[in-house]
């Protein structure tokens, strides 16, 4: 079989159509397929003329309604995006130095943000009412937290062993030996550090306790006067003048899962009858060439199967500026003016049509709402780790989310996805300037969501959590190590955000959000320091002689005190704060029905197992987060990788590589404490034995087989598994369908396969006008690529080729027209198997 015949056989057309094509050479085939019979000055440009025909062979249902257009040079191009209507969106530089702002005010250059009143008098009165209520509630939270912390800290002070604080006089130590003075002060310095750390950590735990408690009361009562969801009755027709864009920024994600979830979401929107009010934008920042081609294929299949021409769009940026936030900003600049609202979706997001329509209705009913965040439920994973985390977030999450809403009201969080945003104020106020200066805490903002919410509120718009709106879903990382990879990026981002704590005009609630974001990760090194100082105090007590006399001519010795009954009482009180939210969560489920969680006994057993699991993982996370915080301050680079979205298990080698140092620390710590005092080892046992077991817990919990076994036993069962909503059932069905027809090695197929080359050529974005300089550059790229083996062609050079329709056409022609000359490419491609289901069957294509 000659190469021309082989080329024709690779086309998804009927045998009769193949027989009608010329077998003389490759150029003749492309000329025969070119309905316009164009003449090309170069023979290796001839594939450009057959792009339309080759696309119609493979994806005839995707080319309706003018999907195929001509660029300025007359080349065929897929209309993957609507015409841009640009808006101005530029950030104001950050002024993080309060001294500099004070100097500006002295010079009459006040930079306080200003905004115009947008509400009627009645709306302003309603707005002022909930803001006053929110302020009062937050003062109550502050008083409760601080009072509880003061009492606990004073109690902690009374049970520490060395109580001679008042007898220490620095002047008496001036004339004595330095070592003697140091040994006298050492226990008290350690105790002071312990006490300060205890106060900070207890305050952090106390705030979480009161948040969960108020969330429990909100959910138990079932009525919330200030819930934003109560502002609509739920069935109002959508305003045709207010259109909504569903935007999904993606970067090197699992293409099958992305498009399965997106299709399920769109099908659910269509089922509501409101699809005409929505458009979908897939905003790709992918830089893996194979994934880029797979995304193009998946988009073509999606618009064909759901009839999404003119409503579902795809764009891949060639310049990845500011990562996800830059991708969203780029959408706003080009197409944002065409929409009143946008819903931001993550790659693993799935939302029902009712939820999306509900968010739009809430926006229309609340004209001063800038962002409304839904409360996504975690589901869809099968590993033991993910199922345990799904159960935890499903059981405990509603309490904390409702509690956050209780304290924050319309000055709340935005989590970056599954939320609706009012586009105009977002464009005007939420562009993010890079943080000034140098170092690891300067440059592009990593965790953009909290900052965008703060800027929206600074401009006078409300930020709400619709915690009681159902139909919003997401997925969790499948194992501990993948979760920690994500946490490292979040840790760095939250530490960066704290630089904005003193920025002018930020609402106190969002300053608190920045603070809690930092404490989410800074609490780990603080806890580690607390444990380290406690251990050091025990070492001092065991190995040194107590200093009974701290003053000259002191009549009575100061004896170290050990009051285990008080220590146990304080420990029990702290455990109540930590675990009472879990108990309240299960109590709420017991009151409202346990059937969807597997029944009374199974949900109770699941709770106990989850508590054990969280105890085992807490010290492991503590050490990892400590390393992340230290890394951020030392300026170690954070790699921005997309998290693992599928059920991926951790190997033993990877586990011991990541957890080996923790295992060693746990062993040394345990042996040392056992040698010093077995009683102290009892208190440290949950910490040290969790570290020793960390590699084993990490591996076993990452296994999908173990997770599926617990699912069969109805442990860690959640309502979405007991009675899956249709949108999740559809997601699983579409995911299986996509996996069966998935495309691997997309770049090589885009070079060789007639259909995928036509697709890549039609979707290439570098469509410049012809020039001699450009032709020289194109020839250089093609020659350099073909003169090397495909293995040596790096990612960046592949992306350059993939972005230019002319280079893709020329590559395609040359490897088929001169296989002997480019034998390394041909041999490499012959070793690649094309999934037979990746393209339509010839008999189906001919019907």
From Swiss-Prot:
Alphabetic keyword roster: Cell inner membrane, Cell membrane, Glycosyltransferase, Membrane, Transferase, Transmembrane, Transmembrane helix
Recorded topology in the membrane: Multi-pass membrane protein
GO CC annotation, single: plasma membrane
Pathway in which this enzyme or protein is active: Glycan metabolism; osmoregulated periplasmic glucan (OPG) biosynthesis
Superkingdom of source: Bacteria
Periplasmic face residues: 157-193, 535-567, 626-679
UniProt-annotated location(s): Cell inner membrane
Main localisation: membrane
One GO MF term: hexosyltransferase activity
Keyword field contains Transmembrane: yes
Annotated function: Involved in the biosynthesis of osmoregulated periplasmic glucans (OPGs).
Family as reported in the entry's similarity comment: Belongs to the glycosyltransferase 2 family. OpgH subfamily.
Protein name stated in the entry: Glucans biosynthesis glucosyltransferase H
Source organism: Escherichia coli O6:H1 (strain CFT073 / ATCC 700928 / UPEC)
Lineage of the organism: Bacteria, Pseudomonadati, Pseudomonadota, Gammaproteobacteria, Enterobacterales
């Amino acid at each position: 079989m000659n190469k021309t015949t082989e080329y024709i056989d690779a086309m998804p057309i009927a045998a009769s159509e193949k027989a009608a094509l010329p077998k003389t050479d490759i150029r003749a085939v492309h000329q025969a397929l070119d309905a316009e019979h164009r003449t090309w000055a170069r023979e290796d440009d001839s594939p450009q003329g057959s792009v339309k025909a080759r696309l119609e062979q493979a994806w005839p249902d995707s080319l309706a309604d003018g999907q195929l257009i001509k660029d300025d040079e007359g080349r065929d191009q897929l209309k993957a995006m609507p015409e841009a209507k640009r808006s101005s969106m530029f950030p104001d530089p950050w002024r993080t130095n309060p001294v500099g702002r004070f100097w500006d005010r002295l010079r009459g250059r006040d930079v306080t943000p200003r905004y115009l009143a947008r509400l009627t008098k009645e709306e302003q009165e309603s707005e002022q009412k909930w803001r006053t209520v929110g302020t009062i509630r937050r003062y109550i939270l502050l008083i409760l937290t601080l009072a509880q912390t003061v009492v606990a800290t004073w109690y902690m002070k009374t049970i520490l062993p060395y109580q001679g604080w008042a007898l220490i006089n620095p002047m008496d130590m001036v004339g004595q030996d330095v070592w003697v003075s140091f040994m006298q002060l050492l226990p008290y310095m350690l105790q002071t550090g312990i006490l300060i750390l205890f106060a900070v950590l207890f305050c952090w735990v106390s705030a979480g306790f009161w948040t969960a408690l108020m969330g429990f009361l909100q959910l138990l009562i079932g009525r919330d006067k200030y819930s934003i969801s109560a502002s609509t009755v739920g069935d109002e027709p959508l305003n045709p003048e207010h259109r909504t864009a569903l935007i999904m920024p993606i970067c090197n994600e699992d293409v099958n899962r992305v498009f399965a979830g997106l299709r399920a979401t769109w099908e659910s929107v269509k089922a509501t009858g409101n699809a005409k009010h929505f458009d979908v934008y897939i905003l790709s920042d992918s830089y893996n060439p194979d994934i880029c081609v797979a995304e193009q294929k998946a988009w073509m299949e999606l618009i064909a199967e759901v009839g999404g021409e003119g409503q579902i769009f795809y764009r891949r940026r060639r310049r990845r500026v500011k990562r996800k936030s830059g991708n969203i900003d780029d959408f706003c600049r080009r197409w944002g003016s065409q929409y009143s609202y946008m819903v931001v979706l993550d790659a693993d997001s799935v939302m029902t049509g009712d939820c999306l329509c509900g968010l739009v209705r809430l926006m229309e009913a609340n004209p001063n709402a800038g962002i409304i965040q839904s409360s996504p439920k975690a589901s869809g994973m099968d590993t033991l780790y993910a199922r345990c985390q799904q159960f935890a977030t499903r059981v405990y999450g509603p309490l904390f989310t409702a509690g956050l809403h209780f304290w924050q009201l319309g000055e709340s969080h935005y989590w970056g996805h599954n939320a609706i945003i009012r586009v105009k104020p977002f464009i005007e106020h939420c562009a993010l300037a890079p943080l000034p200066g140098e170092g690891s805490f300067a440059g592009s903002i990593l965790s953009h969501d909290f900052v965008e919410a703060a800027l929206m509120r600074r401009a006078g718009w409300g930020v709400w959590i619709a915690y009681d709106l159902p139909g919003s879903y997401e997925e969790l990382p499948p194992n501990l190590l993948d979760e920690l990879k994500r946490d490292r990026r979040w840790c760095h981002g939250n530490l960066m955000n704290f630089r904005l704590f003193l920025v002018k005009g930020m609402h106190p609630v969002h300053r608190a959000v920045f603070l809690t974001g930092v404490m989410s990760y800074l609490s780990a090194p603080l806890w580690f320091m607390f444990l380290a100082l406690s251990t050091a105090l025990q070492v001092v007590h065991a190995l040194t002689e107590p200093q009974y006399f701290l003053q000259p001519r002191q009549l009575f010795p100061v004896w170290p005190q050990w009051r285990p009954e008080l220590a146990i009482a304080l420990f029990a009180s702290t455990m109540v704060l930590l675990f009472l939210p879990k108990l309240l969560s299960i109590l709420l489920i017991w009151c409202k029905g346990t059937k969807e969680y597997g029944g009374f006994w199974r949900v109770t057993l699941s709770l106990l197992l989850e508590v054990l699991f969280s105890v085992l993982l807490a010290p492991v996370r503590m050490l990892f987060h400590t390393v992340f915080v230290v890394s951020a301050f030392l300026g170690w680079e954070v790699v921005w990788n997309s998290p693992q979205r599928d059920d991926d298990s951790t190997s033993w080698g990877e586990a011991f590589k990541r957890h080996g140092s923790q295992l060693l620390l746990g062993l040394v710590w345990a042996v040392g404490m056992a040698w010093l005092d077995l009683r102290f080892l009892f208190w440290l046992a949950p910490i040290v034995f969790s570290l020793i077991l960390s590699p084993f817990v990490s591996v076993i919990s990452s296994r999908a087989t173990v997770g599926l076994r617990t699912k069969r036993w109805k442990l860690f069962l959640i309502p979405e598994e007991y009675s899956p909503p249709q949108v999740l059932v559809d997601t699983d069905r579409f995911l299986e369908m996509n996996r069966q027809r998935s495309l691997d090695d997309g770049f090589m197929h885009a070079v060789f396969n007639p259909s995928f080359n036509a697709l890549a050529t039609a979707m290439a974005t570098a469509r410049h006008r012809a020039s001699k300089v450009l032709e020289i550059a194109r020839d250089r790229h093609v020659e350099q690529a073909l003169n090397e083996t495909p293995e040596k062609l790096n990612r960046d050079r592949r992306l350059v080729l993939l972005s230019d329709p002319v280079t893709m056409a020329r590559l395609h022609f040359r490897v088929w027209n001169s296989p002997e000359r480019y034998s390394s490419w041909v041999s490499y491609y012959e070793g690649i198997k094309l999934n037979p289901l990746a393209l339509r069957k010839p008999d189906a294509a001919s019907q």
